[in-house]
Regions:
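Signature of N-terminal electron-transfer/Fe-S-associated modules in redox systems
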Residues: 2-201
Length: 201
Protein backbone atom coordinates (compact mmCIF):
# COMPACT_ATOMS: atom_id res chain seq x y z
CA UNK A 1 0.00 0.00 0.00
CA UNK A 2 1.36 3.41 -0.99
CA UNK A 3 2.10 5.69 1.93
CA UNK A 4 0.36 9.08 2.13
CA UNK A 5 3.71 10.87 2.24
CA UNK A 6 4.70 9.17 -1.02
CA UNK A 7 1.47 10.31 -2.68
CA UNK A 8 1.99 13.88 -1.51
CA UNK A 9 5.45 14.22 -3.01
CA UNK A 10 5.11 12.02 -6.07
CA UNK A 11 6.38 13.97 -9.11
CA UNK A 12 3.89 14.90 -11.76
CA UNK A 13 4.95 13.62 -15.20
CA UNK A 14 4.85 17.15 -16.64
CA UNK A 15 7.34 18.31 -14.03
CA UNK A 16 9.80 15.43 -14.37
CA UNK A 17 12.31 17.30 -16.48
CA UNK A 18 15.23 15.08 -17.42
CA UNK A 19 17.28 18.16 -18.25
CA UNK A 20 19.34 19.51 -15.38
CA UNK A 21 18.34 23.11 -14.69
CA UNK A 22 21.09 25.67 -14.57
CA UNK A 23 20.65 29.43 -14.36
CA UNK A 24 21.85 31.21 -17.48
CA UNK A 25 24.88 33.48 -17.13
CA UNK A 26 22.65 36.55 -17.15
CA UNK A 27 20.23 35.11 -14.62
CA UNK A 28 23.02 33.82 -12.39
CA UNK A 29 24.19 37.43 -12.20
CA UNK A 30 20.67 38.38 -11.05
CA UNK A 31 20.75 35.57 -8.50
CA UNK A 32 24.05 36.83 -7.08
CA UNK A 33 22.77 40.41 -6.94
CA UNK A 34 19.67 39.18 -5.12
CA UNK A 35 21.69 37.17 -2.59
CA UNK A 36 23.74 40.28 -1.74
CA UNK A 37 20.58 41.83 -0.29
CA UNK A 38 20.47 39.24 2.48
CA UNK A 39 22.87 38.46 5.37
CA UNK A 40 24.84 35.26 4.73
CA UNK A 41 23.00 33.58 7.59
CA UNK A 42 19.64 34.50 6.03
CA UNK A 43 20.20 33.74 2.36
CA UNK A 44 17.35 31.20 2.49
CA UNK A 45 15.06 34.26 2.58
CA UNK A 46 15.90 34.79 -1.10
CA UNK A 47 13.83 31.76 -2.08
CA UNK A 48 10.95 33.76 -3.58
CA UNK A 49 12.96 36.08 -5.86
CA UNK A 50 15.06 33.11 -6.99
CA UNK A 51 11.93 31.15 -7.83
CA UNK A 52 10.73 34.10 -9.89
CA UNK A 53 14.01 34.26 -11.82
CA UNK A 54 13.86 30.51 -12.47
CA UNK A 55 10.24 30.70 -13.58
CA UNK A 56 10.98 33.47 -16.09
CA UNK A 57 13.95 31.55 -17.48
CA UNK A 58 11.78 28.45 -17.93
CA UNK A 59 9.00 30.18 -19.84
CA UNK A 60 6.58 30.84 -17.01
CA UNK A 61 6.82 27.71 -14.88
CA UNK A 62 9.22 26.12 -12.39
CA UNK A 63 10.62 22.68 -13.21
CA UNK A 64 11.43 20.33 -10.35
CA UNK A 65 15.11 20.53 -11.28
CA UNK A 66 15.04 24.32 -10.83
CA UNK A 67 13.79 23.91 -7.26
CA UNK A 68 16.66 21.52 -6.57
CA UNK A 69 19.11 24.06 -7.98
CA UNK A 70 17.69 26.85 -5.82
CA UNK A 71 17.81 24.61 -2.74
CA UNK A 72 21.49 24.00 -3.43
CA UNK A 73 22.23 27.72 -3.88
CA UNK A 74 20.54 28.83 -0.65
CA UNK A 75 21.60 25.71 1.25
CA UNK A 76 18.20 24.39 2.32
CA UNK A 77 16.46 21.04 1.78
CA UNK A 78 14.55 20.77 -1.50
CA UNK A 79 11.24 20.44 0.37
CA UNK A 80 11.67 23.97 1.80
CA UNK A 81 11.76 25.39 -1.72
CA UNK A 82 8.86 23.20 -2.84
CA UNK A 83 6.76 24.35 0.14
CA UNK A 84 7.07 27.98 -0.98
CA UNK A 85 6.60 27.26 -4.68
CA UNK A 86 3.47 25.17 -4.09
CA UNK A 87 1.93 27.59 -1.57
CA UNK A 88 1.85 30.79 -3.64
CA UNK A 89 -0.45 30.93 -6.67
CA UNK A 90 2.00 33.19 -8.51
CA UNK A 91 4.37 30.24 -8.96
CA UNK A 92 3.46 27.71 -11.64
CA UNK A 93 4.62 24.12 -11.27
CA UNK A 94 3.27 23.10 -14.67
CA UNK A 95 3.94 24.54 -18.14
CA UNK A 96 1.66 27.42 -19.11
CA UNK A 97 0.60 29.10 -22.33
CA UNK A 98 2.23 32.12 -23.93
CA UNK A 99 -0.44 34.31 -22.32
CA UNK A 100 -1.19 33.52 -18.68
CA UNK A 101 -4.61 34.99 -17.84
CA UNK A 102 -5.31 35.38 -14.13
CA UNK A 103 -8.82 36.57 -13.34
CA UNK A 104 -9.29 38.09 -9.89
CA UNK A 105 -12.43 36.68 -8.26
CA UNK A 106 -12.15 38.27 -4.81
CA UNK A 107 -15.16 40.23 -3.50
CA UNK A 108 -14.58 43.68 -5.14
CA UNK A 109 -13.99 42.13 -8.57
CA UNK A 110 -16.79 39.60 -8.06
CA UNK A 111 -19.26 42.39 -7.21
CA UNK A 112 -18.20 44.16 -10.41
CA UNK A 113 -18.66 41.13 -12.65
CA UNK A 114 -15.57 38.92 -12.55
CA UNK A 115 -17.74 35.79 -12.91
CA UNK A 116 -18.72 37.01 -16.35
CA UNK A 117 -15.07 37.61 -17.25
CA UNK A 118 -14.22 34.03 -16.30
CA UNK A 119 -17.04 32.78 -18.51
CA UNK A 120 -15.85 34.94 -21.41
CA UNK A 121 -12.42 33.33 -21.17
CA UNK A 122 -13.82 29.81 -20.93
CA UNK A 123 -16.16 30.30 -23.86
CA UNK A 124 -13.82 32.03 -26.27
CA UNK A 125 -10.69 30.05 -25.41
CA UNK A 126 -12.56 26.74 -25.02
CA UNK A 127 -10.71 25.92 -21.82
CA UNK A 128 -11.65 25.57 -18.17
CA UNK A 129 -9.94 26.97 -15.10
CA UNK A 130 -6.32 25.78 -14.76
CA UNK A 131 -6.23 24.60 -18.36
CA UNK A 132 -4.15 25.61 -21.39
CA UNK A 133 -5.58 26.01 -24.88
CA UNK A 134 -4.63 23.39 -27.46
CA UNK A 135 -2.61 25.92 -29.46
CA UNK A 136 -0.53 26.68 -26.37
CA UNK A 137 -1.40 30.37 -26.43
CA UNK A 138 -3.56 30.76 -23.32
CA UNK A 139 -3.71 29.45 -19.77
CA UNK A 140 -6.64 30.47 -17.54
CA UNK A 141 -6.54 30.68 -13.77
CA UNK A 142 -8.85 32.27 -11.22
CA UNK A 143 -6.93 33.91 -8.37
CA UNK A 144 -7.43 35.84 -5.17
CA UNK A 145 -6.87 39.59 -4.79
CA UNK A 146 -4.26 41.13 -7.09
CA UNK A 147 -4.33 44.48 -5.29
CA UNK A 148 -6.17 46.63 -7.83
CA UNK A 149 -9.57 46.67 -6.12
CA UNK A 150 -10.29 50.30 -7.01
CA UNK A 151 -10.14 49.30 -10.69
CA UNK A 152 -12.32 46.20 -10.40
CA UNK A 153 -12.93 44.00 -12.24
CA UNK A 154 -9.47 43.25 -13.51
CA UNK A 155 -7.25 40.51 -14.88
CA UNK A 156 -3.50 40.05 -14.99
CA UNK A 157 -2.04 38.74 -18.25
CA UNK A 158 1.63 37.87 -17.84
CA UNK A 159 3.10 40.96 -16.12
CA UNK A 160 0.36 43.41 -17.17
CA UNK A 161 -2.82 44.51 -15.41
CA UNK A 162 -6.00 45.19 -17.41
CA UNK A 163 -8.52 47.04 -15.27
CA UNK A 164 -12.07 48.41 -15.30
CA UNK A 165 -13.03 45.59 -17.64
CA UNK A 166 -16.30 44.72 -19.31
CA UNK A 167 -17.10 41.56 -21.24
CA UNK A 168 -16.55 43.49 -24.47
CA UNK A 169 -13.20 45.02 -23.47
CA UNK A 170 -11.83 41.68 -22.25
CA UNK A 171 -12.95 39.93 -25.41
CA UNK A 172 -11.18 42.61 -27.47
CA UNK A 173 -7.99 42.08 -25.46
CA UNK A 174 -8.16 38.32 -26.05
CA UNK A 175 -8.76 38.74 -29.77
CA UNK A 176 -5.84 41.17 -30.04
CA UNK A 177 -3.56 38.70 -28.28
CA UNK A 178 -4.59 36.01 -30.74
CA UNK A 179 -3.60 38.34 -33.59
CA UNK A 180 -0.39 39.50 -31.94
CA UNK A 181 -1.72 43.05 -31.58
CA UNK A 182 -0.67 45.15 -28.57
CA UNK A 183 -3.32 46.10 -26.01
CA UNK A 184 -3.71 49.15 -23.83
CA UNK A 185 -2.43 48.25 -20.36
CA UNK A 186 -4.13 49.47 -17.17
CA UNK A 187 -7.62 50.93 -17.01
CA UNK A 188 -9.70 50.23 -20.09
CA UNK A 189 -11.78 53.38 -19.47
CA UNK A 190 -10.91 56.20 -21.86
CA UNK A 191 -10.36 58.99 -19.36
CA UNK A 192 -9.12 57.15 -16.28
CA UNK A 193 -5.48 57.10 -15.21
CA UNK A 194 -4.38 54.66 -12.53
CA UNK A 195 -6.68 54.49 -9.53
CA UNK A 196 -7.98 58.05 -9.63
CA UNK A 197 -11.61 58.50 -8.69
CA UNK A 198 -14.17 58.49 -11.45
CA UNK A 199 -15.82 61.83 -12.09
CA UNK A 200 -19.46 60.78 -12.00
CA UNK A 201 -21.94 63.58 -12.61
Amino acid sequence: MERLIDKMFKKNNKNMSENYFKFSKENMSKVNQTLKKYPLSQKSSAVMPLLDIAMRQSGGWIPDSAMHEIASIINVPYIRVYEVASFYSMFNLQPIGKYFIQVCTTTPCWLRGSDSLVNICKKHLTIDNNETSQDGLFTLKTVECLGACVNAPMVQINDNYYEDLTDISLLKIIENLKKGVDNKVGSQLKNRKGGEALNVK
